[in-house]
């Protein structure tokens, strides 16, 4: 959240140059405040686990957030009871006419399937298209990031011979950027996917900006030029044991998975897990919600043309 200061305070320029968010008294006095409305399209198999992970991050901000859970209307969940889905999830037709401050679309275990072969691909495209006029900012995670980059910008992904699984070191590509405020120069984030998009391909696109990347995992944080779409190719929401559970599941299914990199102590699955990413994940979602949802969204959600463009120094 911003620090409110007098309009002409000399410290303002210094703080802004250090990437500290300050707000003049004039702007603060004219700022309307209300709860943020966030929609979550949950594509992960274990709905309750993913709900908990995302709500934990959203709840770690000073903003009040009202959350709606969205499902694919014609898909039956194999790992979550129908009672849970009917009680807590809505169908797209129920929200089609609404506007939201934020939308989160999760990953999905579909990394080895071509997008057009996904049974609900047309519905995913419909929701992505709808979000561009009904949501202030969209956060795409893992598979959803690749799917949206493909659908919106025509970028192609490459299937990997072995799964990219582990906790990898990342670096910022910019020293000053609102989304990266508070980030260390290097930080860790989990990845779990069977595909990757070439870093060079993304950087060549004029409408996209790579904000963080990894030598091992490639582009990690990508932002659209209009600030509406944020693509995160990893899983900052994962809890401590999620990669372990996936490793055990894949082993039991006879997939002979590699041990997740840099996750178990000494890369030994018999040893303890070292969680290195929780603070980063919390900060990433907090920055997104503050700078690209709360600061940009109109007070009156019925008028999405009133979004405030965010300007930052590169």
Curated annotation (Swiss-Prot):
Major site of localization recorded for this protein: cytoplasm
Active-site residues, as the UniProt record annotates them: 142, 235, 237
Catalytic reactions of this protein: L-homoserine + succinyl-CoA = O-succinyl-L-homoserine + CoA
Keywords for the protein's UniProt record, in alphabetical order: Acyltransferase, Amino-acid biosynthesis, Cytoplasm, Methionine biosynthesis, Transferase
Location of the protein in the cell: Cytoplasm
Top-level EC class as recorded in UniProt: transferase
Site (Important for substrate specificity): 192
One BP term from GO: L-methionine biosynthetic process from homoserine via O-succinyl-L-homoserine and cystathionine
GO molecular function: homoserine O-acetyltransferase activity; homoserine O-succinyltransferase activity
Gene3D superfamilies to which the protein is assigned, alphabetical: 3.40.50.880
Protein residues bound to substrate: 163, 192, 249
EC number: 2.3.1.46
Function: Transfers a succinyl group from succinyl-CoA to L-homoserine, forming succinyl-L-homoserine.
Family: Belongs to the MetA family.
Protein name in the entry: Homoserine O-succinyltransferase
Species lineage: Bacteria, Pseudomonadati, Pseudomonadota, Gammaproteobacteria, Alteromonadales
């Amino acid at each position: 959240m911003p620090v409110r200061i007098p309009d002409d305070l000399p410290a303002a320029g210094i703080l802004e140059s250090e990437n500290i968010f300050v707000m003049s008294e004039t702007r603060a006095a004219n700022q309307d405040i209300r709860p943020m409305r966030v929609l979550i399209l949950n594509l992960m198999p274990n709905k309750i686990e993913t709900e908990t992970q995302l709500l934990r991050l959203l709840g770690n901000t000073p903003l009040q957030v009202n959350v709606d859970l969205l499902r694919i209307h014609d898909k039956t969940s194999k790992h979550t009871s129908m009672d849970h889905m009917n009680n807590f999830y809505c169908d797209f037709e129920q929200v089609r006419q609404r506007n939201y401050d934020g939308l989160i679309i999760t990953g999905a275990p579909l990394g080895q399937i071509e997008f057009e072969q996904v049974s609900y691909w047309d519905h995913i495209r419909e929701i992505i298209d709808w979000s561009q006029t009904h949501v202030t900012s969209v956060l795409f995670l893992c598979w959803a990031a690749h799917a949206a980059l493909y659908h919106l910008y025509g970028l192609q992904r490459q299937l990997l011979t072995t799964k990219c699984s582990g906790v990898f070191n990342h670096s910022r590509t910019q020293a000053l950027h609102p989304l990266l405020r508070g980030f260390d120069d290097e930080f860790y984030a989990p990845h779990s996917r069977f595909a990757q998009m070439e870093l060079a391909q993304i950087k060549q696109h004029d409408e996209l900006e790579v904000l963080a990347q990894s030598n091992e995992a490639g582009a990690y944080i990508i932002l659209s030029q209009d600030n509406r779409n944020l693509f995160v190719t990893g899983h900052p929401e994962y809890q401590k044991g999620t990669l372990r559970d996936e490793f055990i599941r894949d082993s039991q299914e006879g997939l002979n998975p590699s041990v997740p990199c840099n996750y178990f102590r000494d890369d030994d699955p018999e040893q303890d897990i070292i969680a290195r990413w929780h603070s980063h994940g919390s900060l990433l979602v907090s920055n997104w919600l503050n700078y690209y949802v709360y600061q940009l969204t109109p007070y009156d959600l019925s008028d999405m043309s009133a979004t405030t463009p965010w300007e930052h120094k590169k």
